[in-house]
């Protein structure tokens, strides 16, 4: 007896394909053309099986495909056609698509999946190496069936949820016997996707052209995609306005330009297509500071933050208040039945008085050294707002400005901070993303992990149990409990839940039509030029 | 010849000192390239990080890293860039062309127009022309290049649509021959203007002051008394002598333009050394950064040498010894 999850998904996917096809008919698709996409930062490598990062997917997603992708109707088969789990959760069987070729003409088979899973997903890929730690082997029972064997139960829904980001097979014949990290194909990827890699001019652009041999017949529509690296946000906005660039994702222009261009009828501006890429703007505490170790103080500080005001002014309304480590985009694992902290500065002051921190002669109760993450404009603005709001309830906050390595070392390795703020992305499933904020025991120097000196045996146990629970319903309940506990104890304030924002030229059609669109393959994207 | 050789030998310890100093200075900055990489990726586990550090040799003590680097540099091996996943030498050669092109066009524009305007202003001191030119110089001098870049971009690209916003060529334009040259030239108009105007104002002001000073000297009066025409006087007697301080400045600024082009290269996304240097600092890409600094120190040494040669050519009283 095997657990089957797929049949409903398949039915939904095929209906979706039909509806999509009819919509496309109605609009009369134009074939050809070059879509130009803005990228803020240069990518080191373009191999998604070595680097789990939206910056990498943004380019490689068109060239290299995952086993499973996510659509608005659920999980969508790409290189896998069917998946199931054994009762004990120790074996997951994945059926692979037949008749698919790599861009160099070699056939795609189970050997590629087995090789990539063991050599890259398990050993080298960030986030994935933790997820696949208990992966023992991948057996190829036939060229198009891969069986993943685990030493500990692996929930099928966790496996599937991880696949869109952490499940890209790479061609074994180009990697086997080489130094994988230095392989030349890491910057010139060979995949099975709708577009073939042509060239990567450092500091300028990446160019990919249509794959004539693509397995989805009749696709893709575009002839070429160009990713242009424009570091300066104002210059990127100018390029959009001049029509030289068609899309800028992940808040690639300044917030002022986001607001300005959203009134411009040449562009679609919004958060569609980022449901799978939501992040939390945070306030992180160093619990080694005895003042902050007091939960009453943390709760009081939360009461001192006017989250709605911050959402309106900083995020221009493109966000919502956070409700703990699972965002509302987290599906069944999310609940809003958790303790919350209304904006009430008077209450905050009373609570701080009660906690034993009255205002002293200096005019403040105590002083905090705050490290803001340098992840773009809105993170800095959030830090400034936080400092201002804290001063209003009598807490003096000194902001220590630093660049990325300085921030990561200051907070996550040297623990040289009282509070910090940054953002952390949710990746489909709490087990492969936000739980690292709460789970203790990670060595100093692990960025984006619980380096806050906060430790709770109860929480650690809950996190470990949820990660290996096979029943999806029970698992969801466990995450609801974790969420409530995190909101009560506030090891970290998950203050604002925000998707990213895209500015897209209306000349692009079928854009932002999946929940992780910027990372997806764009096989149905076309240009009305 | 002996002079050139001596200068060359003198340059070696200077460059070695620069390299060691820079290396140690960079090591003082918090964090290394692995931190920057992990920051870009949005996180990684501890084993991943430790493995990368060992792979990049960053787990060794600083002096071991320095020794290894200097040994490799002695054989002109610049090492591997972990940010670009390419040999540093390849990256530098790729970028050098763009930067030199931008520097050459900007400096020659700034220099020729600057000294011409400066000389004109000086010959008509305190006239309306002088006031106009001096005011213009002041405006150029006071306008930050990033502001000028963005304003030009707004006017010529967004509003008028005459010039491309950035880049060095039209991507996927596949131009060849003269079309390619024209395409690159169109892309260079705004960056050149943005970069050169401030230097233009330097040369203008210096040339104006210098010409006014030289015009009062005895030998100019003597030449005039001997019946030299105004034009001959200007070219042979005044300009040639007035140029000396301007040449000094030009030589000095050659290195500044390398740095000044960071802003312009970043805004116009020109793949040059300035942008690369900036990225390398942010990403803590030691090998690339050291490569750039090595290249720049060589450029500066060579330019200083050429400046000295030019001095001797302009003013025969100066001897190379």
What feature does the model see in each segment?
Chain A
Residues 38-87, 118, 190-192:
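N-terminal lobe/hinge region of extracytoplasmic solute-binding protein
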């Amino acid at each position: 007896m095997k657990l089957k999850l797929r049949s409903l998904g398949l039915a939904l996917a095929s209906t979706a394909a039909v509806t999509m096809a009819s919509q496309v008919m109605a609009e009369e698709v134009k074939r050809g053309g070059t879509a130009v996409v803005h990228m803020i930062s240069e990518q080191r490598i373009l191999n998604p099986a070595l680097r789990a990062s939206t910056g990498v997917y943004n380019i490689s997603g068109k060239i290299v495909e995952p086993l499973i992708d996510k659509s608005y109707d659920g999980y969508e088969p790409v290189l896998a056609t069917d998946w199931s789990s054994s009762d004990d959760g120790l074996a997951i069987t994945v059926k692979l698509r037949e008749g698919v070729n790599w861009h160099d003409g070699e056939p795609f088979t189970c050997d590629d999946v087995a090789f990539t899973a063991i050599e890259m997903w398990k050993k080298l890929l960030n986030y994935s190496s933790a997820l696949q730690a208990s992966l023992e082997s991948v057996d190829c029972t036939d060229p198009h069936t891969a069986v993943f064997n685990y030493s500990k139960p692996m929930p099928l829904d966790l496996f599937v949820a991880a696949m869109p980001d952490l499940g890209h097979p790479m061609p074994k014949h180009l990697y086997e016997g080489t130094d994988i990290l230095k392989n030349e194909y890491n910057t010139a990827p060979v995949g099975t996707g709708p577009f073939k890699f042509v060239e990567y001019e450092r500091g300028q652009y990446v160019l990919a052209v249509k794959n004539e041999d693509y397995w989805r017949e009749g696709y893709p529509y575009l002839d070429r995609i160009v990713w242009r690296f424009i570091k300066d946000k104002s210059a990127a906005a100018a390029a959009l306005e001049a029509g030289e660039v068609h899309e800028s994702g992940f808040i690639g222009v300044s917030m002022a330009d986001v607001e300005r261009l959203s009134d411009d009828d040449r562009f679609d501006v919004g958060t569609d297509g980022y449901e799978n890429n939501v992040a939390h703007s945070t306030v992180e505490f160093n619990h080694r500071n005895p003042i902050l170790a007091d939960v009453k103080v943390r709760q009081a500080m939360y009461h001192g933050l006017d989250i709605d005001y911050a959402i309106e002014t900083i995020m221009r309304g493109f966000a919502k208040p956070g409700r703990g480590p699972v965002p509302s985009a987290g599906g069944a694992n999310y609940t809003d039945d958790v303790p919350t902290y209304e904006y009430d500065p008077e209450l905050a002051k009373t609570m701080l008085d009660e906690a034993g921190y009255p205002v002293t002669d200096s005019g403040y109760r105590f002083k905090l050294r705050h490290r803001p993450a340098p992840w773009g404009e809105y993170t800095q603005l959030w830090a400034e707002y936080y400092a201002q709001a804290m001063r209003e309830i009598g807490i003096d906050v000194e902001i220590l400005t630093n660049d990325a390595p300085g921030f990561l070392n200051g907070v996550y390795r040297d623990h040289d901070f009282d509070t910090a703020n940054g953002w952390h992305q949710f990746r489909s499933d709490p087990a492969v993303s936000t739980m690292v904020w709460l789970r203790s025991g990670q060595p100093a120097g692990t960025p984006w992990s619980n380096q806050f000196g906060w430790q709770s045996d109860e929480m650690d146990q809950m996190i470990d149990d949820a990660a290996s629970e096979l029943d999806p319903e029970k698992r969801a309940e466990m995450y609801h409990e974790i969420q409530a506990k995190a909101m009560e104890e506030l090891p970290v304030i998950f203050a604002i839940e925000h998707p990213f924002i895209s500015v897209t030229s209306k000349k692009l059609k079928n854009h932002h039509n999946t929940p992780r669109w910027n990372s997806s393959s764009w096989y149905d994207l076309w240009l009305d030029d | 010849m002996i002079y050139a050789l001596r200068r060359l030998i003198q340059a070696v310890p200077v460059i070695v000192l620069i390299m060691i100093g820079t290396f140690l200075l960079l090591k003082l900055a918090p964090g290394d390239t692995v931190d920057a990489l992990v920051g870009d990726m949005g996180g990684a586990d501890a084993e991943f990080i430790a493995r990368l550090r060992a792979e990049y040799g960053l787990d060794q003590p600083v002096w071991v890293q320095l020794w290894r680097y200097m040994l490799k540099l002695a054989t002109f091996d610049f090492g591997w860039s972990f940010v670009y996943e390419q040999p540093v030498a390849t990256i530098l050669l790729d970028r050098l062309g763009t930067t030199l092109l931008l520097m050459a066009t900007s400096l020659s524009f700034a220099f020729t127009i600057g000294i011409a305007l400066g000389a004109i202003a000086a010959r008509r001191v305190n006239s309306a022309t002088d006031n106009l030119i001096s005011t213009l110089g002041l405006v150029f001098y006071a306008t930050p290049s990033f502001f000028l870049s963005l304003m030009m971009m707004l006017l010529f690209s967004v509003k008028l649509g005459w010039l491309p916003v950035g880049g060095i060529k039209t991507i996927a334009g596949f131009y060849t021959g003269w079309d390619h040259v024209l395409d690159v030239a169109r892309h260079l108009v705004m960056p050149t203007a943005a970069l050169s105007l401030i230097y233009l104002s330097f040369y203008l002001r210096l040339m104006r002051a210098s010409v006014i000073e030289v015009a009062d000297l005895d030998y100019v009066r003597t030449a005039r008394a001997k019946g030299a025409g105004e034009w001959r006087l200007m070219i042979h007697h005044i300009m040639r002598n007035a140029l000396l301080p301007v040449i000094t400045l030009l030589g000095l600024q050659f290195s500044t333009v390398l740095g000044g082009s960071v802003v312009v290269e970043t805004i116009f996304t020109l793949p040059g050394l300035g942008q690369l240097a900036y990225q390398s600092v942010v990403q803590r890409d030691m090998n690339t950064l050291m490569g750039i600094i090595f290249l720049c120190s060589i450029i500066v040494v060579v330019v200083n040498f050429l400046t000295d040669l030019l001095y001797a050519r302009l003013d025969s009283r100066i001897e190379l010894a």
